[in-house]
Amino acid sequence: RDSEASSAIEASSTDHTVVSTVHGDGGRKAHQRIAFLAQKKEAKNDVGILMEQAALAFPVIVFVHKLANNARKVMEITECVVHDNGELEYRVLYRYRIKRNLYHGGKFTIEGEFVKENTMSEELREKLLRGGVPGPLLERFMGKEMTA
């Protein structure tokens, strides 16, 4: 996995579309895991630099979790904005909020809903447009009309 993490960062950094999986508990921890795996291959690189590279390569993290009822559920969609000074800002865009857990007759039932917590950055919006995501679809996620 260490060479795969390094290759994925490199490919994504050259504007190739890369979709990958990594075991981690949400946005920041996923980037940490990618950075630690990449550091195994490139020990000379600082983990902080690798974290920034991972965040630039993978600005969106989709966190999936297996719940008590054995269902896999998208729990969070998080964007990481890398500021000019290198600071990483994690914004949860959507979160699955569990309202209640029920246990009846040996079976778990989990009730919840998706909640929009933040709007994606303009940088991510532009990147998605360049990548071919239709404007009307992005409008739904931005929560506003897009200008030409």
Regions found by a protein language model. Give the residues of each.
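NTP-binding/hydrolysis catalytic cores, primarily Walker-type P-loop NTPases
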Residues: 73-148
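Short, well-ordered beta-strand core segments
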Residues: 61-63
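Conserved P-loop NTPase nucleotide-binding/switch module
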Residues: 1-57, 68, 75-79
